């Protein structure tokens, strides 16, 4: 049996496409507000997993847990993304926990760089010296200020390249659709580890949440939540490698050169240059983070591929998401729809 340890997870069938899909016209179906409601976990509720796999709960009882990072000694760090949020350290197979950091402004992304733990808050990126043995953190040092960028999409993914030369940060847009955001919103930014040398690495990314380098590669990947209010099947979320200098559509186009009617006639140059993402996901499924699998416990077809977490829709007539899906890779490229997923009945749980 293959064991999946689930700390935060969860429902619905998803189909990822690795070629440009046939998209419906905008407003082919009505814009629908259909949010799920958090309910208590039913007594008999359990995650549904592919044949041959089992699932066990690692830890529970968090306040809006949004991100996990494994430490060098096997500890697991978890961010609680509330107004005065925390970074927790879990040890002893999730049975023991302590607050590493507290009183943070909606902490989200985490990353290691040498002796430092980097933490993304809504308006700031800070680094803390981390004591590996004691599992404690020193005083925070702000390396990047994002003051004023806490409106709209405030979560920030963090990633370092393999050599540790650059820090990459995702910065979402200020709204679902707006023209006139600062040029460094809806982007992936690049800095030196000390916060100097700011550069815009890629643009047109409405809400890039997950941010990681592929194994044995200098290729950065991101998971992106796309815009709303075009109907059930527009605009698809996506999962893609990111080209330096690339433009990915927002707010003028989407999924390649499909012009957004709300920006009709504007920036045809950008519309025409919009990159089609590697993997197109269902619209409004709310993809969050992802992780590449490099272990040996699962069958060979899982190695090198990516697990994606889908939080679930809030504006589709038929709800979608609530699952953890897997996209297989071969030679560093995605090869097809997911081959397995962990899911549960909608609204019982929400993966992050």
PLM regions and their residue ranges:
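Residue-level detector of Asp-centered blade-edge/turn motifs that repeat once per structural unit
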Residues: 70-73, 112-114, 160-164, 214-217, ...
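Asp-box/WD-like beta-propeller blade repeats and closely related beta-sheet repeat scaffolds
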Residues: 97, 101, 106, 111-113, ...
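Residue position within the beta-strands of beta-propeller blades
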Residues: 77-79, 119, 168-170, 221-224, ...
């Amino acid at each position: 049996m293959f064991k999946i340890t689930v700390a935060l997870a969860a429902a619905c069938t998803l189909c990822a496409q690795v070629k440009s899909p046939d998209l419906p016209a905008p407003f082919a179906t009505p814009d629908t507000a259909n949010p799920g409601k958090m309910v208590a976990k039913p007594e008999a509720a359990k995650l549904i997993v592919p044949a041959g796999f089992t699932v066990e709960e690692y830890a529970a009882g968090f306040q809006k847990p949004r991100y996990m990072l494994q430490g060098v000694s096997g500890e697991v760090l978890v961010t609680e993304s509330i107004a005065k949020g925390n970074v927790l350290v879990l040890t002893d197979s999730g049975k023991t926990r302590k607050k590493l950091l507290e009183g943070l402004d909606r902490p989200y992304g985490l990353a290691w760089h040498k002796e430092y733990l980097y933490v993304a808050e809504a308006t700031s990126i800070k680094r803390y010296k981390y004591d590996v043995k004691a599992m404690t953190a020193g005083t925070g040092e702000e390396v990047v200020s994002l003051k004023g960028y806490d409106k709209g999409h405030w979560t920030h993914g963090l990633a370092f390249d393999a050599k540790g030369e650059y820090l990459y940060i995702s910065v979402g847009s200020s709204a679902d659709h707006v023209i006139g955001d600062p040029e460094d919103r809806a982007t992936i930014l690049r800095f030196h580890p000390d916060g100097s040398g700011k550069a815009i690495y890629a643009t047109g990314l409405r809400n890039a949440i997950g941010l990681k380098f592929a194994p044995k590669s200098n290729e950065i990947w991101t998971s992106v939540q796309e815009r709303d209010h075009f109907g059930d099947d527009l605009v698809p979320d996506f999962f893609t490698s990111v080209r330096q200098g690339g433009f990915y559509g927002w707010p003028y186009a989407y999924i390649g050169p499909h012009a957004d009617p709300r920006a009709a006639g504007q920036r045809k140059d950008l519309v025409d240059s919009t990159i089609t993402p590697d993997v197109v996901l269902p619209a409004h499924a709310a993809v969050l983070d992802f992780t590449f699998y490099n272990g040996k416990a699962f069958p060979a077809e899982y190695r090198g591929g990516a697990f994606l977490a889908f939080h679930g829709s809030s504006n589709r007539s038929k709800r979608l998401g609530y699952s953890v899906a897997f996209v297989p890779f071969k030679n560093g490229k995605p090869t097809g729809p997911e081959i397995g997923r962990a899911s549960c009945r909608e609204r019982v749980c929400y993966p992050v």
